[in-house]
Regions:
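Class I S-adenosyl-L-methionine-dependent methyltransferase catalytic core
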Residues: 1-157
Length: 157
């Protein structure tokens, strides 16, 4: 019998957002909040850290979110739920999330498919000092008040 290792599992939960990816999106969205950052890796003028827990805060304006994720982190779904619920209640809120493209999961179909836009990332963005991109596909989920979901691809080049 073949052995199986889960290449999508990660002990590390605090990967820095790839700068090229963020900069390209920031030109479009002009982010003011980084919703899940550290003091060392925050990408926006305003940000929440583990200490002031973005899940417990009010969100407004244009927000970037690279939530902690991995098979050991059930909190990622909490971030997605909050992004969806808050954008439905606040017309001034846009949340752009970078998450794994786990299209086979219930949470992806129940929550992400209600987003205003889903952009499938072409290629494998590199996080931190890694030589290679993640071994899993990533997606940008854009939550804002909308009646339909738009699907596109996002090219880093």
């Amino acid at each position: 019998m073949a052995s199986f290792t889960n290449k999508f599992d990660s002990i590390k939960q605090d990967w820095n957002t790839p700068k090229l990816l963020f900069n390209k999106l920031n030109q479009e969205f002009n982010f003011i909040f980084d919703l899940a950052a550290s003091k060392e890796n925050a990408l926006c003028p305003k940000f929440y850290t583990k200490d002031n827990d973005g899940l417990k805060q009010s969100w407004d304006g244009s927000c970037w979110l690279n939530p902690p994720y991995g098979d050991k982190s059930s909190k990622m779904v909490d971030w997605i739920k909050k992004a969806y619920n808050d954008t439905q209640a606040n017309l001034n809120l846009t949340v752009v999330m970078l998450i794994p493209a786990r299209t086979n999961t219930k949470w992806f179909h129940d929550l992400c498919m209600k987003a205003a836009e889903i952009r499938f990332i072409l290629g494998r963005p590199k996080f931190g000092d890694s030589k290679h991109g993640l071994p899993q596909p990533l997606v940008l989920v854009i939550f804002k008040k909308s009646d339909e979901t738009k699907f596109t691809s996002f090219n880093l080049n």
